[in-house]
A protein has these predicted regions:
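Conserved AMP-binding/adenylate-forming core of the ANL superfamily
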Residues: 2-6, 14, 22-67, 71-75, ...
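Conserved pre-ATP/AMP-binding loop-to-beta segment of ANL
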Residues: 6, 22, 138-155, 162, ...
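Conserved AMP-binding A3 loop
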Residues: 32-37, 151-178, 308
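Structural core segment of the AMP-binding/adenylate-forming
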Residues: 51-52, 79-137, 141-143, 430-432
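AMP-binding/adenylate-forming catalytic core of the ANL superfamily
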Residues: 91, 242, 338, 343-344, ...
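Conserved AMP-binding/adenylation subdomain of ANL enzymes
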Residues: 174-191, 199-240, 255
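Gly/Ser/Thr-rich phosphate-binding loop
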Residues: 239-244, 255-313, 326
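Conserved ATP/PPi-binding loop(s) of AMP-dependent carboxylate-activating enzymes
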Residues: 320-324, 331-355, 392
Length: 487
C-alpha cells in the first residue's frame, strides 16, 4: 500500500478495514475477535481519550500485557492524535516511574493486574485500568497528523544503561510496515502465531506489517511465550509463520518438537538478538520444511534494517537491507540511512547528534557486508571485550561453546582484570550434567589462547531482559557475588 497524503497510522487502519471488511482476524485465549469488533472499539475508545483531554502530540503510556486490548489501544491513541508510549508489563514501579517522569504523559492505560504498580509510579498522572470505561457511543474522526509527527515514543536501552525514549514518526512506522511487507510477503501466507510482547518495537513492527497485508490475515496471539503452549497452538491452528526472538527458539529446541505436527509452519522470523548458527541447523533438522528468516533492526530504525528474503536465506546472516534502506560499515560499525531512522531521542539532543551524523545512524553494532549485500552481525560495539590488547567478540565465544552438546544456552561478558585489562567469563545453562572444568577445556580447544573463557559459571537460567535478550548487565552484576571456575 502506497501513501497518498500524510502517512497517518489511523488512516492506514481505516483503509485496511475498508479494504478487508469484517472477518475473524484475531484469536486470543479460545475466542476469535473480528476485524470489525477491533476497529469499532478503537473508534469508540478514541472518543473517550479525547473526552479525557488527550490532544494531538500527547503521550499516552500503555502498560497492558499481550491481549486484543493492546492493538485497540494503539489505534485509538493514533486516532485521537496521541503518541503511543508502550511500557513492558515487567517493569518495576521505580522503572515505570522514571519512564513516566521522562515522557510526561497525559494518561496511563493499564489493567487491574498492574494498577498498584502504575499508581505508585504515576503520581499526578491520570490512570485508567479498564479500556471499556473509555468507550463512547460516538466515533471520533481522525485527528490530522503529518508524516513527521510522533506516532510512538518507545523506551529502549535496558541492557545499555538508562532507558532512552526513541521518537518514531507516523512515516517511520508506516514505512517499516510497508518495507517489511515488501521484503517478506509470500502470497497465501495468512496464518500467524504471535508471542512477541506488543510493547516492544519488534511486536509493534509485526502489527504494522500486518496492516499492509493485501489479504485477510489471521493471527493467534499469546499473552506471553510458553514453549509447550506455542507448539500446541502452532499445531492446532496450522500456523504458517511465527515471529520469535532467539531465547524463544532455544526454549523450543528443548521441547520434543517431533511430537507435534508442524507441517504447515513455513517460516520462523527471528530478530532482536543474534541467533546461534547451531540452533538454526538443529531447528531445520528437527522441523523439516521450515525456513528461518533472521533479520536485524533496532528500535532506532523502527525495528527494521534487513531481513533474509523468502526462499533465499543465507544462514548466519541477517539478509540484505530492506527497500529504501542503505547500510555502510564505518570502522567495523553498522551505519544506516533510511526513512525508518528515528526522529531522535526524547529530551536528548546531544545524544541524538552523536548517534545520527550526516543522515547516518551509527548503530553501535559491529558487522560486515558480503559481496551480495547480505549483512552479518558480529557483535555489539559496547560488548567488545579487550583482553591483553586483543579484541574478543562475545558472540564468537558463545558460538564455540554452543557446539558442546551439554550446553543449552550461553552468554559471555568481560570483567575487569588487573593483568589483562579484562577477563572473559561465560555463563551457561546445561542440557546434561558436566563439570565446568571440562567446559573450560572444551573452549580452550576451540578458541585462541586470548579468546577462550577462563571462567565458566553454570546457572539454572540466564537472566533475560523483558524482551527476551540475555541480560549482560545482570550477569556482570552476578560476578560480584558468585564464584567461578578459573584455569
Amino acid at each position: 500500500m502506497s501513501a497518498v497524503g500524510p502517512r497517518n497510522l489511523a488512516r492506514l487502519a481505516d483503509e485496511t478495514f475498508e479494504r478487508r471488511g469484517d472477518y475473524p482476524a484475531l484469536w486470543f485465549e479460545q475466542v476469535w475477535q473480528t476485524s470489525g469488533e477491533q476497529f469499532g472499539r478503537s473508534e469508540r475508545i478514541a472518543a473517550g481519550l479525547a473526552e479525557q483531554g488527550v490532544v494531538a502530540g500527547d503521550r499516552v503510556v500503555v502498560m497492558i500485557e499481550n491481549s486484543p486490548d493492546v492493538p485497540v489501544a494503539y489505534q485509538a491513541i493514533w486516532r485521537a492524535g496521541g503518541v503511543v508510549t508502550p511500557a513492558i508489563f515487567l517493569l518495576t514501579a521505580q522503572e515505570l516511574g522514571r519512564l513516566i517522569a521522562d515522557a510526561s504523559p497525559a494518561l496511563v492505560l493499564t489493567t487491574p493486574t498492574f494498577r498498584e504498580v502504575v499508581d505508585e509510579a504515576a503520581k499526578g498522572v491520570r490512570v485508567i485500568s479498564d479500556l471499556g470505561t473509555l468507550e463512547r457511543a460516538e466515533h471520533l474522526p481522525i485527528v490530522p497528523r503529518d508524516d513527521d509527527d510522533l506516532a510512538a515514543l518507545v523506551y529502549t536501552g535496558g541492557t545499555t544503561g538508562r532507558a532512552k525514549g526513541v521518537m518514531l514518526t507516523h512515516a517511520n512506522l508506516w514505512e517499516a510496515g510497508r518495507h517489511g511487507h515488501e521484503a517478506g510477503h509470500v502470497p497465501g501466507l495468512d496464518l500467524s502465531l504471535s508471542c512477541l510482547p506488543l510493547a516492544h518495537s519488534y511486536g509493534l513492527l509485526v502489527l504494522n506489517v500486518g496492516m499492509h497485508h493485501p489479504g485477510r490475515p489471521q493471527s493467534v496471539l499469546m499473552r506471553w511465550f510458553e514453549p509447550q503452549a506455542w507448539l500446541e497452538l502452532a499445531q492446532e491452528h496450522r500456523s504458517q509463520i511465527a515471529p520469535v526472538v532467539p531465547s524463544m527458539l532455544y526454549m523450543l529446541l528443548a521441547q520434543p518438537l517431533e511430537d507435534y505436527d508442524l507441517s504447515e509452519l513455513l517460516y520462523v522470523a527471528c530478530g532482536a538478538a543474534p541467533l546461534a548458527l547451531g540452533a538454526i541447523e538443529e531447528f531445520l533438522r528437527r522441523v523439516p520444511g521450515v525456513e528461518i528468516r533472521e533479520g536485524y533492526g533496532l528500535t532506532e530504525t523502527s525495528a527494521l534494517v534487513s531481513t533474509n528474503p523468502p526462499g533465499r536465506p543465507r544462514y548466519g546472516t541477517v539478509g540484505p537491507p530492506v527497500p529504501q534502506t542503505e547500510v555502510q560499515i564505518v570502522d567495523g560499525e553498522i551505519c544506516v540511512r533510511s526513512d525508518l531512522v528515528m526522529a531522535g531521542y526524547w529530551n536528548e539532543p546531544d545524544l541524538t547528534r552523536e548517534t545520527i551524523r550526516d543522515g547516518w545512524l551509527y548503530t553501535g553494532d559491529m558487522g560486515r557486508l558480503d559481496g551480495d549485500g547480505y549483512l552479518t552481525i558480529v557483535d555489539r560495539k559496547k560488548d567488545l571485550i579487550i583482553r591483553g590488547g586483543f579484541n574478543v567478540f562475545p558472540r564468537d565465544v558463545e558460538e564455540a561453546l554452543l557446539e558442546h552438546p551439554a550446553i543449552a544456552t550461553a552468554c559471555v561478558v568481560g570483567r575487569p582484570d588487573d593483568v589483562h585489562g579484562e577477563e572473559i567469563v561465560a555463563f551457561v545453562t546445561l542440557s546434561e550434567e558436566i563439570a565446568a572444568e571440562e567446559l573450560v577445556a572444551f573452549g580452550r580447544e576451540r578458541l585462541g589462547g586470548y579468546k577462550y573463557p577462563r571462567e565458566i559459571h553454570v546457572v539454572d537460567a540466564l537472566p533475560l531482559t523483558p524482551v527476551g535478550k540475555a541480560d549482560r548487565k545482570a550477569l556482570r552484576e552476578l560476578l560480584t557475588v558468585q564464584g567461578g571456575t578459573t584455569t
